[in-house]
Amino acid sequence: SILSRSLKQDIILGTEIKNENEVIIDNQYMGQLKGLKLELDLKSGSLKTDIKSLKKAARQAISPELIRRVGKIVESEVLSFNDDYKICWKDHPIAYLTPGKNYLNPKLELLVDDAIDQESKEKLKNNLEGKLQKLITSELSDLVKLSEAKFQNNYVRALCYQLFENNGVMKREIIDKMVKNISKEDRASLRKAGVKIGRYHIFLPKMLKPNAVDLRIKLWKLHFPNDQKYIIPKSGLNFLKNESKKNNKFLLICGFENFDKFYIRVDILERLFLKIIENNKNGMFKIDSDMINLIGCTKENFFKLLE
């Protein structure tokens, strides 16, 4: 109550921030800074007029510190977001992502206190959006190029569109007629753009790397919330058992093709096919350890797979 009366009389009170986050006004604990937001510790007995005055005083006091923090965040190089699409600074959310025009272009919204001026907010938002775009462009370069590709051939354009709409992995059989109408020259152009036209699948090999899979699937799940319940396979796996009911469509965009009780990564499947061709004699081929090691499964499961 003494603090409240002092505030109403416009008395200048001493303010400090202890232990990085504790806000102290006139030697009284007022709350904590969590990232770029103030969380006041208001007593249940405080009057509404007191609360209003306390909030005003606290926000005036912390404004310089929050602006300083914005500067620190802007200077930092690293940006990442967690599974609930929040961008954090020192374990506290400062922004979050929402679906944008497509899965590679999410929107970014700030989670900051009103004590931060509009200019600093805009500076922070522009900085975070720039870092996010840089992350996407760096890790998912082939997908980005695919979305921006300008080919004259209608079939090539249609293939690129379909491949982008399927997050860089799709069954060849779906667009095989289209593929047959693509010239050798256009196939070479597609290869330069990072597109692999395989025996069974059309995909972007670089987008099957662990970091790329993690990022593009996170962005996909943000844009298509119905896929949130599905889990990305652990990185480094070429072979999965279908022990529970898995979603074949989701696992395909993760890079895995279904074979009844098993899943195999599509690029590994292409390599297996080439090994079989190399070992083929009169329509027969000999299974060797290289084939089994390539898939990363037991000999027993390999034979079941061939069945």
Spans of model-derived segments:
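Extended, charged helical/alpha-beta scaffold domains that provide interaction surfaces
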Residues: 1-307
